A protein has these predicted regions:
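Alpha-helical transmembrane segments of polytopic membrane transporters and translocases
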Residues: 5-27, 59-60
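Interfacial segments at transmembrane-helix termini and the short loops linking adjacent helices
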Residues: 6, 72-103
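Short alpha-helical transmembrane segments in multi-pass integral membrane proteins
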Residues: 53-74, 79-82, 141, 147-172, ...
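Membrane-interface junctions at transmembrane-helix termini in multi-pass inner-membrane proteins
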Residues: 98-128, 139, 143
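Hydrophobic alpha-helical transmembrane segments in multi-pass integral membrane proteins
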Residues: 134-138, 189-205
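Membrane-proximal transmembrane or re-entrant/amphipathic helices at the cytosolic face
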Residues: 198-243
Length: 243
């Protein structure tokens, strides 16, 4: 019905999307730092610095996206119930988990392309994504409801991200190790968080203290960052690129 559709759309735009976009404040801040750094390096024809900065920022954006995706996949339903007291919010949060890596990477890639002075390129790619989203809204949403809209949202973001990435790979000649920076961290984090989720639920059943049990996420996140550091995915040297 119309009331149900408006209720779900309100949950999506007012509750779920702000939750998805919240970690993106990190990539948004990174984009602010990137724009002058890339513009300065591009003006000096320092292609090595441009390649190195692009590689590092893509890596960190991917890791942030993978981490948030794994958290929302495993704890989306719990967060929906715990924070918003809404089962629908939890379902939508879980469904949109895969949006995170592409959304965060697109933000940084767009800033790099703008720093290179190619704002028309980012505009064109954004228009392509919007056309896909509007097309899904017209053709899929009437048939599949909110899932048609979510499919269009995810597809458009993937297309924009891929267009940005392919353009930068041709422009700066960088290579992105997808297995090292996306696949294996994703498998590790999803597995680790799934195990912690089972352990937390058993602990909640025994102690009846949900707030205390979810504190176990802190050592899990610490273990994740330790894994990133030990595998060479993050480094102290990377910070110097933005100075």
């Amino acid at each position: 019905s119309l009331e149900d559709a408006l209720a779900i759309y309100g949950i999506l735009t007012g509750i779920v999307l702000p939750f998805i976009l919240f970690p993106g404040t990190i990539t948004n801040s990174l984009s602010v730092l990137l724009l002058p750094a890339i513009s300065r390096a591009s003006g000096k024809k320092d292609n090595h610095h441009v390649r190195q900065t692009t590689s590092v920022t893509v890596r960190y954006s991917l890791l942030l996206g993978v981490l948030t995706c794994a958290v929302f996949l495993n704890y989306g339903m719990d967060l929906g119930q715990f924070v918003f007291h809404s089962e629908n919010a939890g379902k939508l949060l879980t469904l949109l988990a895969f949006l995170c890596p592409f959304l965060y990477v697109t933000t940084t890639l767009g800033s790099i392309i703008n720093g290179l002075g190619k704002t028309v390129i980012t505009f064109a790619f954004t228009v392509i994504g919007l056309i896909i989203r509007i097309g899904c809204l017209f053709f899929l949403a009437p048939v599949y409801g909110i899932f048609g809209y979510l499919f269009g949202l995810l597809c458009s973001q993937i297309v924009i991200c891929l267009c940005h990435g392919i353009y930068l790979m041709k422009k700066t000649h960088i290579t992105i190790q997808v297995a090292k920076y996306f696949v294996w961290p994703f498998v590790f984090l999803v597995s680790l968080l799934y195990i912690s989720k089972i352990f937390c639920r058993n602990l909640i059943h025994l102690t009846n203290q949900p707030y205390l049990s979810y504190l176990l996420l802190i050592p899990v996140l610490f273990a994740s960052f330790l894994y990133f550091y030990q595998c060479g995915l993050i480094s102290k040297k990377d910070i110097k690129l933005f100075r």
